[in-house]
């Protein structure tokens, strides 16, 4: 006689979920199917807090002030120039570098963000609870600098809701020999100063590309100068962020308030959520008035957490000793 052990499947087995009992096939699928997403990638400004806070408007004004006070740009041109640079380069900072201005990045960020009305932001416990309940990797992806990102998240009470922050310094690691893809190093790569201070932040007029005059022509000839800055909505910036964080674009959900950033994300394979309007646009898989509408708009995001809520009822399969 020889004895052996095996797991018997002849005993009755049933489990229940939120909606009731699951049959055997549903039980198998429940434990074998992967969630649709591995990671939720969030923009910061005007996405995790509303546009009505006034920070975006203040940021634009601060950029104009910096251009006039520190770069000696004619106040009569600063407003138009700010608009054209943002439209054509993704950020005003990237545009200023493209057309020939030299300045210290840390100084500009400190000037522009240091004067923002952070007092308009308040802790958001509702958003915090929602984010903490989502069973995925969660990352911030912003064009802003690390100081602003940290301060904003801290005020909102969300500083520990995210695994890491991909920011200006992450995407523009000047003076680094390589970009780390270590997940533990996602937060704030490339913290070294990205340009050396110059004796003057202004530049001679002969060195500056006149983008206003160029675009005012009926048929502008040539192409605009390229910027050394990597930022959204560049597809290269999004692909770099995905590489740094080791993300599969087809298993990542991207949250943004910018239509052009949403469309760029869609082009690289991301599923996308436009925040700030309920009107869907080309490139947006979902459109929400507020990030707070997420549970109602995409309830499936919480289904990935179903396994932790499974309740077993009845008799389970048990190890049985048999004689053969």
Locations of regions flagged by a protein language model:
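Short, flexible active-site loop motifs that bind/organize anionic cofactors or intermediates
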Residues: 68, 98, 117, 139, ...
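Short, surface-exposed alpha-helical recognition segments that flank or form part
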Residues: 54, 118-122, 140, 225-233
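Asp-based, Mg2+/Mn2+-dependent phosphohydrolase catalytic module
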Residues: 1-37, 132, 146, 150-324
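N-terminal helical cap/lid subdomain that shapes the substrate entry/recognition surface
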Residues: 2-3, 7-42, 47-125, 136, ...
């Amino acid at each position: 006689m020889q004895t052996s052990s095996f797991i018997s499947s002849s005993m009755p087995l049933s489990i229940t979920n939120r909606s009731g009992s699951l049959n055997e096939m549903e039980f198998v699928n429940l434990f074998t199917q992967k969630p649709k997403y591995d990671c939720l990638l969030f923009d910061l400004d005007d996405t995790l807090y509303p546009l009505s806070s006034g920070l975006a408007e203040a940021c634009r004004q601060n950029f104009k002030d910096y251009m006039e006070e520190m770069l000696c740009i004619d106040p009569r041109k600063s407003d138009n120039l700010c608009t054209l640079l943002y439209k054509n380069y993704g950020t005003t900072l990237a545009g200023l570098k493209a057309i020939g201005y030299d300045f210290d990045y840390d100084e500009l960020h400190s000037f522009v963000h240091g004067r923002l009305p952070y007092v308009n932001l308040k802790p958001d416990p509702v958003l915090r609870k929602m984010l903490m309940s989502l069973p995925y990797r969660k990352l911030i992806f912003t064009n802003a600098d690390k100081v602003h990102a940290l301060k904003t998240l801290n005020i909102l009470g969300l500083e520990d809701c995210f695994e890491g922050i991909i920011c200006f310094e992450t995407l523009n690691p000047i003076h680094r020999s390589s970009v780390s893809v270590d997940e533990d190093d996602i937060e704030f790569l490339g913290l070294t100063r990205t340009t050396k201070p110059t004796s003057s932040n202004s530049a001679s007029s002969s060195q500056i590309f006149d983008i206003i005059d160029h675009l005012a022509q009926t048929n502008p000839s040539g192409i605009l100068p390229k910027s050394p800055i990597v930022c959204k909505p560049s597809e290269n910036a999004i692909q770099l962020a995905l590489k740094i964080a080791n993300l599969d674009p087809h298993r990542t959900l991207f949250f943004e308030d910018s239509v052009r950033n949403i469309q760029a994300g869609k082009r690289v394979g991301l599923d996308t959520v436009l925040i700030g309007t309920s009107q869907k646009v080309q490139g947006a898989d979902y459109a929400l008035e507020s990030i707070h509408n997420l549970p109602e708009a995409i309830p499936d995001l919480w289904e990935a957490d179903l396994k932790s809520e499974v309740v077993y009822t009845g008799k389970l399969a048990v190890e049985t000793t048999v004689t053969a």
